[in-house]
Swiss-Prot record:
UniProt xrefs under SMART domains: ELFV_dehydrog
Quaternary organization: Homotetramer.
Family assignment from sequence similarity: Belongs to the Glu/Leu/Phe/Val dehydrogenases family.
Species per Swiss-Prot/TrEMBL record: Neurospora crassa (strain ATCC 24698 / 74-OR23-1A / CBS 708.71 / DSM 1257 / FGSC 987)
Its EC number(s): 1.4.1.2
SUPFAM superfamilies xrefs: Aminoacid dehydrogenase-like, N-terminal domain, NAD(P)-binding Rossmann-fold domains
Protein name: NAD-specific glutamate dehydrogenase
Length: 1050
């Protein structure tokens, strides 16, 4: 913190204010806060003499003389009118003295002259409307003056609120923060009787904080405030801000306060929220209160260095608005409820329809959410595609390739996001009817609604689903429109619960019934599905079983084109990852799940905010709401308790601790097991630190060498996913092969004579990309091509024109220097049916062995083509399962220990020292990962030799056999046999846990459903690994007879 005596940068206003007395009130009325509450629950502000106090500008009279001289010399304004124009500008517009102190006489003269010119220009207009517009923008402050009608949103002209918002409030430079003051002139412009327009003045100033690096939890105004705010704000105003900031620092959504002003028709609305979490909300708030026939006399935006923004708006009924509007108190009540909805999506895709009054805020945000839904789930393949599948031979590679290409083509053409937007925008009445149906189910009306009931949307008859279907058919004009609008009905019928109507939300989340998904595209039915929409992103969470585990990944896009591709593939990629996880989780109690968050094109640096909103909004649907007014109960059509188990994935490893602590702060009883991969101080077992995923991958690599009696040191190896990644770095550190190529996010590193191992290990330990490789350690045939490189000549004379394109396709090159390929990173489907032929030469695979460490790197049909060409392929669902085993055993420990035991035995102390039990438990987890990997490797190798079936098929067959038997066993009578149950659990649970806690205590603490899952998965996996995926009908009897014999001996 800055010390009181520390020198601070010069600040023109603050320096002038230091010792100025006396000060007089601002020309705008301001008010003092008293701890008095009236009948509507608002605090009451009584005095009109305090609030913001403008400093007296002692040099004002002298400045006016200088301004007059400049204007007269300019000659643009008739000399007889100069005094009147100056007096009007200085005294009638309500401009604060701060402006006159900050500006030099020349700038003031220019502004007065410009305003006069606007009046002259208006005189020549046919409608004689005076439209005065003025702007002055500098790097540290700005001024905007515009003509506006109270209570009306203008769609023409410069739209200064949007401009100052995008340039100053939501600007890209996060080191600069700006405060805003805006006033409306008391009188109207023009001489005409029906003139309604007034001048609106905006003043923007760069903040100069007392302590610019304040802690996010700091709330003392004397530490976190801007110096100009401290100089201008009175004691009572500071108290209002102090109170709301103290609440805001512990809240993730907006905090809203309303103050009545005694003896006035005005009310003061104060909104506090975390800075830069709601881009566009300043101008959107104006649209919101205009919708309810309300206007503002003054607005302030104050920034604080702890990361909080506070907006203070003085509201009154807009007297000039025609039409019926509710009383101010009721309008304000509705506005405060809708601010949390606006905060979630300040600028939705249909916002202009709200600003123009065509649709309500709820209707436009609902339409935006369904617009997102439609992009992912409009059934674009149709019945013709289903017929084609039936007609073609799935075993014929050329047929499969045709289907694959047709599926991609059908999904990319016709229904673009813009086309869907255009269709929805052309049917506002249908949107209104469909929203009414949605709200009739999910809007819970309580006493809070009864007291201030006004219709937030025009009254609409709620139609049944059948009547909605008829209305859609009747209103639309073609098949495409019917498909899009019918998707609204699909969405409404799929929503089981949502936080759409709960206060203080930060994003919109929907728990959907996934039964609407077409079986032909998604053959394995999902158990659960969440859709989350934030102002920065969209995302899904999918799971295949009630108790399921999987990571949360954030997808970034390097360009708009990359975003469009990522958006198109988002759900399919999520489904594929969750499906892989389901197969990968065969050895553990949990089924497969996955969460994917896609950042919007202009929000690529907002991954933390997107993740936090995603987690918090999902928690809204998992936790029981017990704080009325903050988290109200929701309509729950699902009707059962749900728990999600999550973990780290791409771009989320550093966010896991926050998610764990946030779940604890929100009162989740399962906070210890909510996320795995958390830091050791919270009892986590970091996969990267202990190489958990790599240990499993290495068992498959070593297994191939063992079976074929190969010398690893003579194996030439290629790897995607470099030394900067979790899996890539540990693969380098544990390997003993000769690396010939590494591809990572920065580019390609290749050396046919072998890449220097010591230099690679140095990068792996530092988690550095290959861009940091010392190229002096390459041989004469080696090279490095970075993504940003162009026109690079390789040692063999080949010219690389584009480094990024070279990086993206390097793994497909036939250069004859790769024996073993281990993908440890890279985008899904990097090798598919259309590209796999580049790895096949004269019917033979150019790479003999592939162990797929990265999820979904190779499509299933491409794997089969490679195996057909003689390649030994072990797929991701088999090889990459070490992390899930570690995560599962981490959760088991958190469920088995009580809170005190968990902290003692699983959490590192403040100095980073690991408890003795923790160290031993990690070793047991590592051994378990290697044992499970060896068991599956041997089972697949053995069954391949017996049946000749491709290993990629056998991997899936084993997974399916285990998961199917697992489900049967959990429901079987075997679970009811106490001897068998205890015997299996004793074998399945880690010995260390049993010795430390005791089997009986573990059984008592761990939920019954979780114990059943442990029982089923252990028995099923051990049986299938021993007897194969297609055992005889007597095999299980033999297996259990042997186990019963052992039990009886005990």
């Amino acid at each position: 913190m800055d010390s009181p005596s520390a020198p601070v940068p010069a600040h023109k206003l603050v320096d002038r204010l230091k010792d100025q007395t006396p000060r007089h009130p601002s020309p705008q009325p301001t008010h003092v806060s008293y701890p008095k509450v009236n009948g509507n629950g608002h605090r009451v502000l009584r005095s009109a003499t305090v609030g913001y106090v403008a400093p007296v500008f002692q040099g004002k009279a002298e400045q006016m003389k200088q301004v007059k001289n400049i204007i007269v010399q300019g000659g643009w304004i008739p000399e007889t009118l100069v005094d009147g124009q100056i007096a009007w500008f200085y005294n009638e517009l309500g401009i604060d003295d701060v402006y006159f102190q900050l500006e030099n006489p020349q700038a003031v003269a220019n502004h007065i002259t410009s305003l006069y010119a606007a009046k002259v220009a208006a005189f020549s207009r046919e409608d004689k409307r005076e439209e005065i517009r003025l702007d002055m923008e500098a790097s540290d402050h700005a001024i905007y003056i515009d003509t506006s009608e109270p209570g009306m949103t203008s769609f023409d002209g410069p739209r200064y609120e949007h401009r100052l918002e995008s340039k100053y409030l939501d600007g890209d430079d996060t080191s600069k923060r700006f405060r805003v003051e805006t006033f409306r002139s008391p009188g109207v412009l023009g001489q005409k009787e029906n003139s309604k327009a007034a001048l609106r003045c905006y003043f923007v100033y760069q903040c100069l904080f007392v302590d610019s690096n304040a802690d996010p939890k700091e709330t003392r105004l004397e530490v976190i405030s801007d110096r100009m705010f401290l100089a201008k704000a009175t004691k009572n105003t500071k108290q209002i801000y102090q109170d709301i900031i103290q609440v805001a620092v512990s809240r993730h959504g907006p905090v809203i306060e309303v103050f009545d002003i005694e003896g006035s028709e005005e009310m003061r609305l104060v909104v506090a929220f975390r800075s830069r979490t709601a881009k566009g909300i300043f101008s959107a708030l104006s649209d919101l209160y205009h919708y309810y026939g309300v206007t503002s006399s003054r607005k302030y935006v104050e920034q604080f260095s702890n990361g909080i923004t506070v907006m203070s708006i003085y509201l009154r009924p807009a007297a000039n608005i025609d039409g019926k509007h509710p009383p101010l108190e009721q309008s304000i009540h509705q506005i405060t409820k809708e601010i949390s909805l606006l905060y979630c999506l300040p600028q939705n895709k249909f916002h202009n329809m709200f600003a123009s009054g065509e649709l309500s805020l709820q209707e436009t945000i609902y339409a935006h959410c369904v617009w997102v839904f439609v992009q992912h789930f409009l059934n674009r393949l149709g019945t013709e595609y289903t017929s084609l599948i039936a007609a073609l031979d799935p075993k014929n590679n050329s047929h499969v390739e045709i289907l694959s290409k047709m599926k991609k083509r059908l999904r990319t053409e016709t229904f673009t996001p813009d086309y869907i937007l255009e269709i929805i925008s052309s049917h506002p009445q249908l949107v209104r009817a469909l929203y009414a149906s949605f709200a009739s189910v999910h809007l819970r009306v309580g006493s809070d609604y009864d007291r201030h009931l006004i219709a937030p949307t025009p009254v609409m008859e709620v139609l049944s689903d059948a009547r909605l279907k008829e209305k859609i058919t009747k209103d639309v004009s073609n098949e495409h429109e019917e498909m899009v609008m019918t998707a609204f009905r699909v969405f409404n019928n799929a929503v089981l619960k949502t936080n759409f109507f709960t206060p203080t939300k930060v994003a919109l989340s929907f728990r959907l019934n996934p039964s609407f998904l077409p079986e032909v595209e998604y053959p394995k039915p999902l158990y659960g599905m969440f859709l989350v929409i934030t102002s920065e992103s969209r995302g899904f969470h999918l799971r295949f079983k009630d108790i399921a585990r999987g990571g949360i990944r954030i997808v970034k896009s390097r360009s708009k084109e990359a975003y469009q591709i990522n958006a198109r593939n988002l759900f399919d990629e999520n489904y594929g990852l969750a499906s892989t996880q389901q197969r990968k989780n065969k050895d553990i109690p949990e089924g497969g799940s996955k969460g994917v968050i896609l950042l919007d094109p202009k929000q690529q640096d907002r991954h933390r905010e997107a993740f936090e909103k995603y987690i918090d909004s999902i928690l809204d649907l998992l936790l029981k709401a017990e704080t009325p007014g903050i988290k109200n109960p929701i309509v729950d059509l699902y009707g059962k308790e749900e728990i999600l188990f999550m973990g780290p994935d791409e771009n989320t490893a550093d966010l896991v601790d926050w998610a764990t602590e946030h779940a604890r702060a929100r009162g989740a009883p399962w906070w210890k097991s909510f996320f795995t991969g958390k830091s050791p101080r919270l009892g986590g077992i970091p996969h990267d630190s202990y190489g958990m995923t790599t240990l499993s991958v290495r068992e498959y690599v070593k297994g191939i060498y063992r079976k074929l009696e190969l010398d690893p040191s003579k194996i030439r190896k290629m790897q995607t996913g470099g030394p900067d990644g979790d899996l890539g770095s540990n693969e380098i550190l544990l390997s003993n092969e000769t690396y010939t190529a590494i591809v990572d996010g920065s580019g390609v590193l290749c050396d046919p004579n072998g890449i220097d191992k010591d230099e690679l290990r140095r990068l792996a330990k530092a988690r550095a990309m290959i861009s940091n490789f010392d190229i002096a350690k390459l041989s004469k045939d080696g090279y490095r091509v970075l993504c940003d490189d162009t026109n690079v000549t390789l040692p063999n004379g080949e010219v690389v024109h584009n480094g990024t394109a070279f990086r993206n396709t390097y793994h497909l090159r036939d250069n004859g220097i790769t024996d073993m390929f281990v993908p440890c990173g890279g985008r899904p489907e990097s090798i598919d049916l259309s590209s796999v032929n580049k790895l096949i030469k004269d019917g033979k695979s150019t790479i003999p062995y592939i162990v797929e460490g990265a999820n979904l790197f190779i499509t299933q049909d491409a794997k089969l083509r490679l195996e057909e060409a003689g390649c030994i392929v072990y797929k991701d669902a088999s090889a990459n399962k070490g992390g899930v085993t570690s995560s599962s055993l981490e959760v088991l420990a958190s469920l088995s220990f009580d809170d005190k035991g968990f902290v003692t035995h699983m959490c590192h102390d403040s100095r980073g020292n690991a408890p003795e039990f923790y160290q031993a438990y990690v070793k047991e987890v590592q051994n378990k990962i290697q044992d499970n990997a060896r068991l599956e490797f041997e089972a697949i190798w053995r069954e391949h030799e017996q049946t000749g079936l491709p290993r990629s098929v056998l991997s899936d067959k084993l997974s399916l056999a285990i998961t199917s038997l697992d489900e049967d066993l959990q429901r079987s009578e075997l679970w009811d046999n106490e001897k068998i149950r205890r015997s299996v659990l004793a074998d399945a649970l880690p010995n260390l846990l049993i010795n430390k806690i005791g089997l009986d205590t573990i059984i008592e603490r761990v939920p019954d459903s979780y114990l059943r899952a442990i029982f089923g998965s252990y028995l099923a996996s051990r049986f299938v690994y021993e007897f194969g995926s297609s055992p005889s009908q007597f095999a299980f009897y033999d297996f259990m007879s042997k186990r019963m014999g052992n039990i009886n001996k005990e």
